[in-house]
């Protein structure tokens, strides 16, 4: 990347991640002054010129979600008023993604509202990472890139479990498309958990569709919130005599008692390994060998180079999957 024409900034939730990205790119991270006034208002100032530059700004809109989102909106406004040539907002985690439709009367579609806010603030392009539902792309009236991370995870998980006797498992019907993409890319069998959700953050797994007995099962999901879905799925897989059960999720929110639930699942042998990415800073598991964080810095490095060189992002996935097939 040409540091004279491109500049990379990070807001509060992605600083460690972007530091590694810039280190790989051998370019400095842009400097930002970020303060909070006594009444809680956010102040942001960019400490270098962005005039006529292509700007890439990273932020995960994770907890506290509203503060993280407002920080991003203010930063985009500052870049726009600073005459940036283009502003690409890269969101490793996109908050409010689950509020993407109305299920009852008088409900909002907050994911669409957030898309409108980002567009109005002045962003030129948005990159979303393993979004909860593909329809989110249609909420924007600007270019949107939906980045996939499965190939980054598979390098580690397949290396650990091996392809023999490996089954990809979707913890519910909503995740079938995601799980099938992974299973198809490596020519692996697919299993599905039949689940119902009687209330918010409450999940019940009922049955397994597919052969999992004496198999190494890899449960695939986009995010883990309270952990109820994947732990219930793991328990059901064990009841169906699965040999190993590992969980792979891009976004680890781990709200409420999720860390304690997973620690109990590790201790009871329900879950062998839990893999999440650093799309959200991970601080809730200390020195736990079963909990592994997959670094997304190499992926974002490649994505930024694609932006800088006007090349195809989809080629990244093809190249990595071919490498996994040959070497893992």
Swiss-Prot record:
Provide the residue positions that the database annotates as binding ATP.
39-41, 98-99
Query: Which Pfam family would be a valid example here?
Result: Pribosyltran
Quote the catalytic activity from the record: D-ribose 5-phosphate + ATP = 5-phospho-alpha-D-ribose 1-diphosphate + AMP + H(+)
Q: How is the cofactor bound?
A: Binds 2 Mg(2+) ions per subunit.
Mind telling me which SUPFAM superfamilies this protein's record contains?
Answer: PRTase-like (SSF53271)
Biological process terms from the Gene Ontology for this record are: 5-phosphoribose 1-diphosphate biosynthetic process; purine nucleotide biosynthetic process; ribonucleoside monophosphate biosynthetic process
Using the UniProt record, give the first listed, main subcellular location: cytoplasm
Where D-ribose 5-phosphate is bound, by residue?
197, 221, 225-229
Name the residues that bind Mg(2+) 2. 172
Query: What's the stated role of this polypeptide?
Result: Involved in the biosynthesis of the central metabolite phospho-alpha-D-ribosyl-1-pyrophosphate (PRPP) via the transfer of pyrophosphoryl group from ATP to 1-hydroxyl of ribose-5-phosphate (Rib-5-P).
Please give the family membership noted in the entry.
Belongs to the ribose-phosphate pyrophosphokinase family. Class I subfamily.
Q: How does it assemble?
A: Homohexamer.
Q: What is this protein called?
A: Ribose-phosphate pyrophosphokinase
Q: Which organism is it from?
A: Mycoplasma pneumoniae (strain ATCC 29342 / M129 / Subtype 1) (Mycoplasmoides pneumoniae)
